[in-house]
Amino acid sequence: MGVGRSEGGRRGAALGVLLALGVALLAVGSASEYDYVSYQSDLGPYPGGRFYTKPHQCVAIPADLRLCHSVGYDKMVLPNLLDHETMAEVKHQASSWVPLLNKNCHMGTQVFLCSLFAPVCLDRPVYPCRWLCEAVRDSCEPVMQFFGFFWPEMLKCDQFPQDYVCIAMTTPNATEVSRPKGTTVCPPCDNEMKSEAIVEHLCASEFALKMTIKEVKKENGDKVIIPRKRKALKLGPIRKKNLKKLVLLLKNGADCPCHQLDNLGHHFLIMGRQVKTQHLLTAIYKWDKKNKEFKKFMKKVKAPDCPTFPSVFK
């Protein structure tokens, strides 16, 4: 991704989170003052609190938990704050958020998500601040809508605390938590030519096609892509007999640039998902067999190591 944050930037942001959290905990007393028989929440998101059937434990964040491995701390609590009791379940659920993290829609995205998926080890659960949730939601939901998704119910911001002990990056009005500037590229077109990133998109998409494009036009705020030739790499919900009639939409993309579409004389790798009767483009790459990273992807495409993505966005 051309505008992706560096790992150092993410770690710096996470350090700010931990410092803010430390100050907050000092304000209400040391962790040893809390007497919890089991891992219980009383912070409002889950009225009446909750108990887990298993005692909580502090475990290392594994390298293949890609959403949170670079968050800035090394250990997390299981069960987490989304009721995932095993690491396998955490990885399964968290994997669907990695493409959004790579879109860099807000610098607090990783901190917010990992405070829930991979909470830092403390004597009691601490949730993200409501304003952090709102800031991430307001910046990232417009990006999600390009892919046909909306902010999910499981992350409704009004369930998180406003002014109690909570995870924060800095003050709500700080300029550094605003959405990074400098890109107006349609999010599905803002892709890094790295084999791992292409595989992530393939796994997160319902279908994938090699195609040439006949025409691109604007209609009702979308870019409409009319294929000339197409070959299915992954059909998903598309029936083979319907391939000839397939039309793709770059949702909300009428007025944002998609540089891959500036020259239609190439073959393209196009991925997407079906929403009702529409087929939305979720990623586009020039089909470039001379590119080293694309060649790596082609070796992996026959048997990609894909998790089964949960329907967390519905």
Swiss-Prot record:
SMART domains: C345C, FRI
Chief location of this protein within or outside the cell: secreted
One Pfam family cited in the UniProt record for this chain: NTR
Disulphide bonds in the chain: C58-C121, C68-C114, C105-C140, C129-C166, C133-C157, C186-C256, C189-C258, C203-C306
Matching InterPro entries: Frizzled/SFRP, Frizzled_dom, Frizzled_dom_sf, Netrin_domain, Netrin_module_non-TIMP, SFRP1_CRD, TIMP-like_OB-fold
A GO molecular-function descriptor: Wnt-protein binding
The keyword Signal is assigned to this record: yes
Domain NTR per the UniProt entry, residue ranges: 186-306
Any one of the GO CC terms: extracellular space
Alphabetically ordered keywords of this record: Developmental protein, Differentiation, Disulfide bond, Glycoprotein, Secreted, Signal, Wnt signaling pathway
Superkingdom in the source lineage: Eukaryota
Domain (FZ) ranges: 53-169
Gene3D superfamilies: 2.40.50.120, Frizzled cysteine-rich domain
Subcellular location per the Swiss-Prot or TrEMBL entry: Secreted
Leader sequence residues: 1-31
Keyword Secreted assigned: yes
Glycosylation site residues: N173
Gene Ontology biological process terms from the UniProt entry: canonical Wnt signaling pathway; cell differentiation; non-canonical Wnt signaling pathway
Domain notes: The FZ domain is involved in binding with Wnt ligands.
Family from the record: Belongs to the secreted frizzled-related protein (sFRP) family.
Protein role: Soluble frizzled-related proteins (sFRPS) function as modulators of Wnt signaling through direct interaction with Wnts. They have a role in regulating cell growth and differentiation in specific cell types.
Protein name in the entry: Secreted frizzled-related protein 1
Biological source species: Gallus gallus (Chicken)
